[in-house]
Amino acid sequence: MLKLFSAFRKNKIWDFNGGIHPPEMKTQSNGTPLRQVPLAQRFVIPLKQHIGAEGELCVSVGDKVLRGQPLTRGRGKMLPVHAPTSGTVTAIAPHSTAHPSALAELSVIIDADGEDCWIPRDGWADYRTRSREELIERIHQFGVAGLGGAGFPTGVKLQGGGDKIETLIINAAECEPYITADDRLMQDCAAQVVEGIRILAHILQPREILIGIEDNKPQAISMLRAVLADSNDISLRVIPTKYPSGGAKQLTYILTGKQVPHGGRSSDIGVLMQNVGTAYAVKRAVIDGEPITERVVTLTGEAIARPGNVWARLGTPVRHLLNDAGFCPSADQMVIMGGPLMGFTLPWLDVPVVKITNCLLAPSANELGEPQEEQSCIRCSACADACPADLLPQQLYWFSKGQQHDKATTHNIADCIECGACAWVCPSNIPLVQYFRQEKAEIAAIRQEEKRAAEAKARFEARQARLEREKAARLERHKSAAVQPAAKDKDAIAAALARVKEKQAQATQPIVIKAGERPDNSAIIAAREARKAQARAKQAELQQTNDAATVADPRKTAVEAAIARAKARKLEQQQANAEPEEQVDPRKAAVEAAIARAKARKLEQQQANAEPEQQVDPRKAAVEAAIARAKARKLEQQQANAEPEQQVDPRKAAVEAAIARAKARKREQQPANAEPEEQVDPRKAAVEAAIARAKARKLEQQQANAVPEEQVDPRKAAVAAAIARAQAKKAAQQKVVNED
């Protein structure tokens, strides 16, 4: 009795809420064996035939490829695609693919050569000696994905299951009307399917393996039971026919009684599900060493003369398959990829077959009936009764129409499996699944935009934080640099601190006064002298720095000279425009000329004492000399135009002439006695000597043109001139001696 109850509990099945029983229409195509289709002339292989990102291209236009050769590289969730036959890559461009939107996706276009040559195949007949990681990597690199309709990469799914999988379920229900691809595959290739199941079990090591199949497939059930006759590790469960019992959550509940939580996965409850076609593809990848390049596709509908199931190469145009099956289109013929409830209408027939293509339905006009006009919802709740996911389709419909995305999300629109049961039973002919698909797409787009905005905000905040850190570090550096004394001031600060400490120490010492003795102030005097010497040294250093800064800038010197010349020109113009009655004092003019010459000599000395690297422009020196000569001539004219009543002292003029000649001789001697390092411009010295001689001649002329009424003693004048020359010579010699 205990064994009877155990057997009953072992084979127990559960039933889910909702569901419908539409006409099956499977007998049109499940009665004939699988057959091959002739190769098409051109194949279009989309790079993305799965959930996830497309792989990286590893071929280019003009390459020769063989069947099974990878066209892309698979990394992470990127699943590679392979060449369905041998040929030449003629283009890599966007092409419309099998999708409700009919958007173009990047595809590899291959022209077949007709030879259909395989790449070298390396099968692992002894797969049990391989590690779990090696088997998963081989399955992934051979492009195996879920062939039941989702297209999730099988290798990633097996890797994510890990060691927590207790139950492996093989989905053989195939509940949607018209589709018989899995049914025919189990009838013709039952042994290979079971071998693929054993490979999956070897990878996952589950406690139990369950095959769920509907009772409307008697031939497939018989073939599987025959293959599993000697096996005790795999259990075949026959379930009642009900749509959509082939859904992942529904079949999991039917076989185990466990429900997948909202927003969760079946692996959260220790269950992993694979399709019958996926198990067959795993067997071919591991044991035969063949990547997935073809799959079983059902060709059915009253518009097809020879319905059945065929081995269709991936990338084959839909038109080629339909024409091979005797397609007879009507005026408004439609072709549906998938079943009548979950499939979608193709915009044109040039789209290729992909990994998730399981059926091509070409119904006649009478087969599906006339399209009904959409009417208003009457709140009958028939859709809620039929929903297998226990949702409220009428509420989701209103939320979808009203763009109320938050409420739709709260009502678990993500759990909708888009089975179409609600639309099937709706008396108002509302295409509820279309509304739900659009709403889920909009929610996904909003979440993607929010994710991008959050990432952009995070990048902005990180940048702002980095800028704030850099600013704080910069301010800290500036603050420390301002507070920290310079290296040259550290000694002065240390000396000041030492003096303060010394004074404090002296203040604490008692003062002893002895009668008849003088106090010893030598230490204090020495300290005072040291401070004075230090202050003088510091002042001298600052003075040298300022002088160096002043002398070292030749441009500043030139600017100052130009300003002085401009001021001199302005004074000359003012004197020239003065009233005629104004009396001109020749001595004052001579003094001003001497001051101007002194300033000129000072500027020349500053330029001469500049850095050795400074180059003297001879043209500029010539221009300055010419300007000086012009000023001298102007002063001579002013003195000549003075009033004749002005009396000139010939002795004073003689003395000035002698002094001028002495200065001229001194200038001539200075270049010889100058330091060898000093660079002297010979042209400039010659110009200055010429100017001095001209001034001497001018003074001699003034003496000759003196007023005749004045009585001059020639002997006194000669004596005075001789004395002046002697004094000038003596002063020049004394200055030379001092300079040496």
Curated annotation (Swiss-Prot):
Matches recorded under Pfam families: Complex1_51K, Fer4_7, RnfC_N, SLBB
Domain 4Fe-4S ferredoxin-type: 369-397, 407-436
Cofactor needs: [4Fe-4S] cluster
Ligand binding ([4Fe-4S] cluster 1): 377, 380, 383, 426
InterPro entries, sorted: 4Fe4S_Fe-S-bd, 4Fe4S_Fe_S_CS, Ion_transpt_RnfC/RsxC, Nuo51_FMN-bd, Nuo51_FMN-bd_sf, RnfC_N, Soluble_ligand-bd
Subcellular localization, as worded in the UniProt entry: Cell inner membrane
Protein EC: 7.-.-.-
Claim: Membrane is one of the keywords in the record: yes
Cellular component GO terms held in the UniProt record: plasma membrane
UniProt GO BP: electron transport chain
Family named by the database record: Belongs to the 4Fe4S bacterial-type ferredoxin family. RnfC subfamily.
Subunit structure: The complex is composed of six subunits: RsxA, RsxB, RsxC, RsxD, RsxE and RsxG.
PANTHER family membership: ION-TRANSLOCATING OXIDOREDUCTASE COMPLEX SUBUNIT C
Role according to the record: Part of a membrane-bound complex that couples electron transfer with translocation of ions across the membrane. Required to maintain the reduced state of SoxR.
HAMAP family attached to this UniProt entry: RsxC_RnfC
Identification of the protein by name: Ion-translocating oxidoreductase complex subunit C
Protein's gene: rsxC
